[in-house]
Amino acid sequence: MKKVFLLGLSMFCLLLLNAQTQTIRGKVVDKETRQALANVSVKITTATADSLLSATADANGEYAIAGVSVGRHNLLITLQGYKEVVLQNIIVSSAKEVILNIEMEEMVMEIGTARIVAKSKQTEPNNENALVSARLFTVDETDRFAGSRGDPARMASNFAGVQGADDSRNDIVVRGNSPQGVLWRLEGIDIPNPNHFAIAGTSGGPISIINNKMLGNSDFFTGAFPAEYGNSVAGAFDLKMRSGNNTKTEFSTQLGLFGWDLMAEGPFSKKSKSSFLVTYRYSTLAIFNALNINLGTDAVPRYQDLSFKMNFPLGKKGNLSFFGIGGNSNIDIIISNQKESSTELYGDDDRDQYFKSRMGTAGSVFTWNLNKKSYLNAVVAVSNQNINSMHQLVFRHAIDSFIRPSGQKAYRYENDSIIKNLRYTFKTSTIGTNLFINTKL
């Protein structure tokens, strides 16, 4: 029976190896006007058999290259009257199609002698007002850089002038500035600290709520911020969400140290160009604990997060999308149920500790082409953050008459914001006292 199983598994693997191809597709638009560009040439330049593969964008600016082998590939995008665009190290996997939406910049030439040099757009930021101290990063880099773990903050610690913390948190020091001065933005809106087990007033945490599989090309700033980043004094992450596959429904799952990921994307209907993209993650350690697997401690971190984006093209005139991200986390370090004090890996041996945190952001992006030279982009979003920490002191071997009540403080922090320039903030704080006595005579 064992030999039959191994033989069947080997045949299944051979079948998979014979079908390792995928499709690269997307849309090409003008960087300034957001208008679709037709007759754009998209060619694979990797020195393999795939170098013969290419495609031409249709009247809607859409292109598709089928039969691309699995691996890393380079793309060259050209159109007469526009600057060349070079995309390097594009990862193609057999699990899902690769969607690349490309922006091309018009090339202006004066009459006379002209020298044209092809320039890679790999690190040029999306924000046209960013002249220095800004860098574009891709989804691939959040996985490929050393110690990134799919986290944009940990990835940024590999850049010049950026120093990361220890492995327990993803706080970053940018050019000597405090990590508290780092700003997080999503789709053009400031958002609260997007990390599980976040501490009030900080910008980092042990585990990021952001799933890098949801991100498109995004910007990271280390200084000389444009005026729109007015609340940043150290660094800024300007994150963009990608749209889901609008022609094919795809599902994927991944189990790792930091969680079990489930992701789905596809079109709402075959006739529509609208699409959805949603991902959910749950704590791996919490799953192991539910299966009665001994983790060496009862203080198991539990967390989960959800991200989504729904995209609805409005023809050639504009686009409407809805996005959201949120997560909650909690951990309880309880020692009061022990007869004698013991040393836990985390926490103190004289108190029970309860910690909860959650954050969420949901909004909408509306883009409307006013004419061939201008467009309107409006973003509306609502954000919320709640952090609750509670400590309960435990007294052992005590005499009741000599016990003086003292003990726990509960801290609560909330932050609600509406729209980018019209902001409403609500903050509350509570302090309470509680006493737990474990008397042993």
Segments the model singles out, each with a brief description of its role:
Residues A19-T113, K119:
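Periplasm-facing N-terminal accessory domains of Gram-negative outer-membrane beta-barrel systems
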Residues Q180-V182, M214, T247-F251, S272-F276, ...:
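Outer-envelope beta-barrel architecture signal
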Residues K121, P179, I191, R242, ...:
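Structural signature of outer-membrane beta-barrel domains
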Residues G204-S208, G216-P226, G235-G266, F276-Y282, ...:
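Short strand-turn segments of transmembrane beta-barrel domains in outer membranes
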Residues G67, A165-D166, Y229, Q254-G256, ...:
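Short sequence motifs at beta-strands and strand-loop junctions characteristic
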Residues T297, N319-N369, N384-K427:
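Flexible loop and strand-edge segments within Gram-negative outer membrane beta-barrel domains
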Residues T23, G256-Y282, L295-I333, Y354-V382:
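Transmembrane beta-barrel wall of Gram-negative outer-membrane proteins
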Residues D58, K83, I90-I99, T113-F225, ...:
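Periplasmic N-terminal accessory/gating domains of Gram-negative outer-membrane beta-barrel systems
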